[in-house]
Amino acid sequence: MSRKIEGFLLLLLFGYEATLGLSSTEDEGEDPWYQKACKCDCQGGPNALWSAGATSLDCIPECPYHKPLGFESGEVTPDQITCSNPEQYVGWYSSWTANKARLNSQGFGCAWLSKFQDSSQWLQIDLKEIKVISGILTQGRCDIDEWMTKYSVQYRTDERLNWIYYKDQTGNNRVFYGNSDRTSTVQNLLRPPIISRFIRLIPLGWHVRIAIRMELLECVSKCA
């Protein structure tokens, strides 16, 4: 997708109003799911997030307000979440499919467990349409000490296109650090956000076994 199209999508996005957001800073122990007043600095001024005629992601290094996409709430449907080697999920593993990768899920089958433990495994989300994704939340398995310790992210706007790795400032594939226990939620914000339809998490490290509960954060505009 060209920079001009990306810019146009962001311009449309930030033209809408939003009244509910998540803090764009890392959670330091307080509940991140709270209402926050909007500031009207979307255009003009030294802290502007968007300026007239802007056509690149450089104009929006980070998203100020976020909302959960719907893994935990169920708005993200089972058919939107897929994984590597789906045909292997039979017997005991049939309770630990990709659809179980939902933040704060509890009980038996509370996470996605990869059948194989190597860096060729993946968890994929089809957003059904192009969205602006600004963050990723992860947890480990709820009942046993198994979790993902680090991962990379791929994305693409169309299933006919090749996957693109999310890069760091040096141009290398960015490594996101994940969990260190089974219960804590680790938040990684995307600066800049990803504008895409398909998102993949590629586990690069894990404790005992690849186990993921997750949520995606969608970027929403500031109030007009």
Curated annotation (Swiss-Prot):
Predominant cellular place of this UniProt entry's protein: secreted
GO terms assigned for molecular function: phosphatidylinositol-3,4-bisphosphate binding; phosphatidylserine binding; protein-containing complex binding
Keyword vocabulary terms for this entry: Cell adhesion, Cell membrane, Disease variant, Disulfide bond, Lipid-binding, Membrane, Secreted, Sensory transduction, Signal, Vision
Entry's localization field: Secreted; Cell membrane
Outcome when changing H207Q: In XLRS1; decreases protein stability; does not abrogate oligomerization or secretion
Tissue expression as described in the entry: Restricted to the retina (at protein level). Detected in the inner segment of the photoreceptors, the inner nuclear layer, the inner plexiform layer and the ganglion cell layer (at protein level). At the macula, expressed in both the outer and inner nuclear layers and in the inner plexiform layer (at protein level). Detected in retina. Detected only within the photoreceptor cell layer, most prominently within the inner segments of the photoreceptors. Undetectable in the inner plexiform layers and the inner nuclear layer.
Recorded disease: Retinoschisis juvenile X-linked 1: A vitreo-retinal dystrophy characterized by macular pathology and by splitting of the superficial layer of the retina. Macular changes are present in almost all cases. In the fundi, radially oriented intraretinal foveomacular cysts are seen in a spoke-wheel configuration, with the absence of foveal reflex in most cases. In addition, approximately half of cases have bilateral peripheral retinoschisis in the inferotemporal part of the retina.
Listed InterPro entries: FA58C, Galactose-bd-like_sf, Neuropilin_MCO_CoagFactor
Keyword Disulfide bond attributed: yes
Protein name from the UniProt record: Retinoschisin
Lipid bilayer topology: Peripheral membrane protein
Domain F5/8 type C: 63-219
BP GO terms, sorted: cell adhesion; eye development; protein homooligomerization; retina layer formation; visual perception
Signal peptide bounds: 1-23
